[in-house]
Curated annotation (Swiss-Prot):
Task of the protein: This enzyme scavenges exogenous and endogenous cytidine and 2'-deoxycytidine for UMP synthesis.
Protein's name in the database: Cytidine deaminase
Organism of provenance: Escherichia coli O139:H28 (strain E24377A / ETEC)
Cofactor note text: Binds 1 zinc ion.
Quaternary state and interactors: Homodimer.
This protein's encoding gene: cdd
């Protein structure tokens, strides 16, 4: 079991501990539960889906990286496939506060970058901030997404974001988590190709500036993140954050990164290079390359 889970795991009910122990035994537990695993946990504990998600939130929050605030937020995004995806907030010392990742963004990106097609619900241990409510409004589940908070009745996103502004106001038809492929040729080594493939999946209807980041760890594992724009612009999630979300949730740490590649257009209206390289250097990675999409 990864050390970060030990304290939260010890506080779970005995029957949930017993059912989870073989799942968490792998140091690189992927921070997700398949539909089959969810069903097994429900049977072992007698909990319904909502109660189980709440019970698992401490494990999601244990994935938080909060050296600045020490305020850990956990989220679980429930995919329509039946898979549940953990997420947690992340802060980066030496970078800017704008690089921060919120727990809801983490769980949603985890689902999206894992190939999930849509979300049915999201469970969070603290009420979503306005930034996250706006981020969620970019999803193809839209204002119907169910939000579950401890001690409250579940409500749809529309209840948390009245008079919402979103992609439909800008006549955007393709939404976040819809399948997209921008068709750029995969060239170069495996890491470059992973970055280009991530750029091909970008959701960037506002700037038309595709980008993707791929991180290579010392053991050869590669984590890729795609750019995810938002109708309100500021809640946009850069591609580096997507890759860092996966790296963190899958049990790796920043010193594990040995090389990074950013893929983007040289003449795009928005450029990720400066922010990407600055944040990576703050995290200790100095082997950073840029490949141009063609």
């Amino acid at each position: 079991m990864h050390p970060r889970f030990q304290t939260a795991f010890a506080q779970l009910a005995d029957n949930l501990q017993s059912a989870l122990e073989p799942i968490l035994a792998d140091k690189y537990f992927p921070a997700l539960l398949t539909g089959e695993q969810v069903s097994s946990l429900k049977s072992a504990t007698g909990l319904d889906e909502d109660a189980l998600a709440f019970a698992l939130l401490p494990l999601a929050a244990a994935c938080a990286r909060t050296p600045l605030s020490n305020f850990n937020v956990g989220a679980i995004a429930r995919g329509v496939s039946g898979t549940w995806y953990f997420g947690a907030n992340m802060e980066f010392i030496g970078a800017t506060m704008q690089q921060t990742v919120h727990a809801e963004q983490s769980a949603i990106s985890h689902a999206w970058l894992s190939g999930e097609k849509a979300l049915a619900a999201i469970t969070v241990n603290y009420t979503p901030c306005g930034h996250c409510r706006q981020f969620m409004n970019e999803l193809n589940s839209g204002l119907d997404l169910r939000i579950h908070l401890p001690g409250r009745e579940a409500h749809a996103l529309r209840d948390y974001l009245p008079d919402a502004f979103g992609p439909k106001d800008l006549e955007i038809k393709t939404l976040l988590m819809d399948e997209q492929d921008h068709g750029y040729a995969l060239t170069g080594d495996a890491l470059s190709q992973a970055a280009i493939a991530a750029a091909n999946r970008s959701h960037m209807p506002y700037s038309k500036s595709p980008s993707g980041v791929a991180l290579e760890c010392k053991d050869g594992r590669i984590f890729s993140g795609s750019y995810a724009e938002n109708a309100a612009f500021n809640p946009t999630l850069p591609p580096l954050q997507g890759a860092l979300i996966l790296l963190n949730l899958k049990g790796y740490d920043y010193p594990d990164i040995q090389r990074a590649v950013l893929a983007e257009n040289a003449d795009a209206p928005l450029i990720q290079w400066d922010a990407t390289s600055a944040t990576l250097k703050a995290l200790g990675c100095h082997s950073i390359d840029r490949v141009l999409l063609a």
